[in-house]
Amino acid sequence: MSHTVKIYDTCIGCTQCVRACPTDVLEMVPWDGCKASQIASAPRTEDCVGCKRCESACPTDFLSVRVYLGSETTRSMGLAY
């Protein structure tokens, strides 16, 4: 079952989600939108097991990284209108 990993622009570049991921789905990439000059990226979503450890590790008030399990709809991802 495939899962979708979405990174929001509230990411502060702390790397907590990257370090928490047991399957190395996430990595940091350069980004000028935050003080750390980097943002999480999810280039290997096919390896996501849906454990949501990245979500648990995120220190921001609004989770900057979210895992949408294969059974969740596009509406829950905010893509439907």
Curated annotation (Swiss-Prot):
GO biological process: photosynthetic electron transport in photosystem I
Entry EC no(s): 1.97.1.12
Annotated positions binding [4Fe-4S] cluster 2: 21, 48, 51, 54
Annotated membrane topology: Peripheral membrane protein
Residues in 4Fe-4S ferredoxin-type domain copies: 2-31, 39-68
Keywords, sorted A to Z: 4Fe-4S, Chloroplast, Electron transport, Iron, Iron-sulfur, Membrane, Metal-binding, Oxidoreductase, Photosynthesis, Photosystem I, Plastid, Repeat, Thylakoid, Transport
Principal cellular location given in the protein's record: plastid
SUPFAM superfamilies in alphabetical order: 4Fe-4S ferredoxins
The reaction(s) this protein catalyses: reduced [plastocyanin] + hnu + oxidized [2Fe-2S]-[ferredoxin] = oxidized [plastocyanin] + reduced [2Fe-2S]-[ferredoxin]
InterPro entries listed in its UniProt record: 4Fe4S_Fe-S-bd, 4Fe4S_Fe_S_CS, PSI_iron-sulfur_center, PSI_PsaC
Cofactor note: Binds 2 [4Fe-4S] clusters. Cluster 2 is most probably the spectroscopically characterized electron acceptor FA and cluster 1 is most probably FB.
Pfam families: Fer4_7 (PF12838)
Disulfide bonds: none
Cellular component terms (Gene Ontology): chloroplast thylakoid membrane; photosystem I
NCBIfam families: PS_I_psaC
Role, per record: Apoprotein for the two 4Fe-4S centers FA and FB of photosystem I (PSI); essential for photochemical activity. FB is the terminal electron acceptor of PSI, donating electrons to ferredoxin. The C-terminus interacts with PsaA/B/D and helps assemble the protein into the PSI complex. Required for binding of PsaD and PsaE to PSI. PSI is a plastocyanin/cytochrome c6-ferredoxin oxidoreductase, converting photonic excitation into a charge separation, which transfers an electron from the donor P700 chlorophyll pair to the spectroscopically characterized acceptors A0, A1, FX, FA and FB in turn.
Name of the protein described by the UniProt record: Photosystem I iron-sulfur center
Protein species of origin: Chlorella vulgaris (Green alga)
